[in-house]
Every structure is written in structure tokens, then in C-alpha cells.
Amino acid sequence: FWDEGINEKIEFSNMSAGLKIFTVLQQLISNYSLKRGDVLIVDEPEVNLHPTWQITLAEILVRIYKELGIFILANSHSPYFIRAIEVKMAEYECALQGRYYFMKQDENAYISTDVTENTNEIYDALYQPLNLL
């Protein structure tokens, strides 16, 4: 990674955690490591990102899907990021292809429930801790 203000190469190990996701995505695309029809799995990609950058990341992921035909499987605990995905999917006219699942704890396991038609269940759960304050 190059910082124009410093004119020095910044080693990946010295980058902030938030910057690393953008760098990895850029490298995967520029190296042609991802091909149409591939599945990119990203685990909580919004971690260490300011909410504004979460929106930017959501748009990048939606564009990777829309323009490159690469499927994205992401999990998140961020209502900002999830909402940004919903909004950007609509903006890029691919909202009908998006699916949203919520993991619910049962007595012995977690059960995945499709909440695409009512994502409020996700937001209710994510905002629940605020009610404890």
C-alpha cells in the first residue's frame, strides 16, 4: 500500500485493521484471484471501521457482486453495515438477489432463519443491548 502523503510503501503488517479489508479486496480483484461465479466469504468485514467507512465497504462489496458477478457471503453485527448493504443493493438494482439470515439460539444449537422479508428482526436484536443502559 502506498500513502501519497508519505511517498513510502506501507507494509501490510503495519496497516490499521480497518484499512486491511480494503487492501485485501483491491489485491484480490487486481490479481484476478476472484472470477465470475466465485463466492467471497467475509467474516465481519466492518470490524474496526467507522460507520462512514462501513457504508463505503458495503458499496464496494455490492459493486463486486453487481459488476464482477462474484457472490458475497458476509456476516455482521453492525446495523450500519447491514443497512448499507440493503440500501446499496437497492441502488444498484440487485436487491432481489440479496438474502438476509438471522442466527437464533435454540436449546442445543443455533438455527439460521431467512429474514429477508423482515430484516427488522436483525435490527431489533442488534439494538437490544442499548435497552440495558
Predicted features, each with a name:
Residues 2-131:
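Switch/communication elements of ASCE P-loop NTPase nucleotide-binding domains
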